[in-house]
Structures are given as structure tokens and as C-alpha cells.
């Protein structure tokens, strides 16, 4: 399991639009349709990565808590499903059901969404304000598989608390660590 850090995109960057298949309802959805009134969290995740499996339950808990404040959550899987069949849309849907996802789980078949977001690893978190300007990018918390630190979503929660109060904490930005996105071979 190779550790890959997230790419630290500049704060203030606008969220690129997309139109991706939501495997939970078998329908294409755009960012404009899914964004939250107060803010939007875009998470690059997948099914097979141990780092993602480690945080899935916490992600759902945080999403349930902050959706009440007008923040929407969107999960995207961009992995090459030919070489990583565990990340297929069918198994994505099963994963969403197993973990009781309360947010859309989108399949980025062309990987273009991961490219324009400069996503580097799974899990990777991007928090946008109501104008879809980036206010946080990075990790959920310091917990990793096997390091015995609590998986509490502390960093993401702090970023969301700042967002709710219309503030940005530039010192809070800490890269995520996870599995690299599994890029298709040309």
C-alpha cells in the first residue's frame, strides 16, 4: 500500500463543474445540481483503498452532522476499473449501501474530473464555500490504518466549522495521505 499525498491546490480556486454518474441512483448529476447552500465537500474516494476503508464510517457521520447546516457532500471515484475491478460502478453502489452513504457517489469514468481537480490520492477532501471557492483541501484527520490515532475527522470538521462562520483558516491546511488514484494507461 503506497502512501501518496494530496496535491495542495490554491485556496480560492473555483470548483470545476462536472456531469458524472451517481451510482446510487443510476443518474447523471452536475456540481450545480449537487452543491450546498452554505458549502460543498468533494471527496475523492474509492472502494479498495485501505485508507478509505479506514475512514468511511467517520465520513458518513460528519456528512450527516454538517448537512443540517447546508453543506452538501459529494464522493467521486476516478480509479481505472479495468485494473481495479473492486472500484467498478456496481461495487461502488454496494459500498454506498454497506456504509449507508448519505451523499451521492459519482463515477468519473474518463478521469477528467480528477484531473481538473488535481486530485492525487484517496481519500482527498476539498471544501468549497457557497460561491464554490476552495477554502480547505487535505486530510480528514491524522488517523491512518495501523497508527492507532482516533479517526475523528478533526481536520475536516474544523474546516467546516470555519466555513459555517464564514472564516478560512489557512494554517489548517494539511495534505491527505492515501492510495494514489489509479490512472488509466494510455
PLM features per residue range, with description:
Residues 1-164, 168-173, 180-183:
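Chalcogenol-based redox active-site neighborhoods
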Amino acid at each position: 500500500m503506497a502512501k501518496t499525498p494530496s496535491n495542495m491546490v490554491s485556496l480560492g480556486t473555483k470548483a470545476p463543474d462536472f456531469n458524472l454518474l451517481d451510482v446510487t441512483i443510476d443518474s447523471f448529476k452536475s456540481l450545480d445540481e449537487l452543491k450546498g447552500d452554505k458549502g460543498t465537500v468533494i471527496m475523492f474516494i474509492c472502494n479498495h483503498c485501505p485508507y478509505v476503508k479506514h475512514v468511511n464510517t467517520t465520513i458518513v457521520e460528519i456528512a450527516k452532522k454538517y448537512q443540517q447546516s447546508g453543506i452538501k457532500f459529494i464522493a467521486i471515484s476516478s480509479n481505472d476499473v479495468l485494473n481495479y475491478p473492486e472500484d467498478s460502478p456496481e461495487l461502488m453502489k454496494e459500498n454506498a449501501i454497506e456504509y449507508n452513504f448519505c451523499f451521492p457517489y459519482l463515477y468519473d469514468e474518463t478521469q477528467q474530473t480528477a484531473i481538473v481537480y488535481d486530485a492525487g490520492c484517496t481519500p482527498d477532501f476539498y471544501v468549497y464555500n457557497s460561491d464554490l471557492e476552495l477554502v480547505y483541501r487535505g486530510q480528514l484527520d491524522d488517523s491512518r490504518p495501523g497508527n492507532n490515532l482516533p479517526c475523528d475527522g478533526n481536520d475536516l470538521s474544523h474546516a467546516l466549522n470555519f466555513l459555517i462562520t464564514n472564516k478560512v483558516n489557512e494554517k489548517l491546511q494539511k495534505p491527505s495521505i492515501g492510495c494514489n488514484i489509479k490512472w488509466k494507461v494510455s
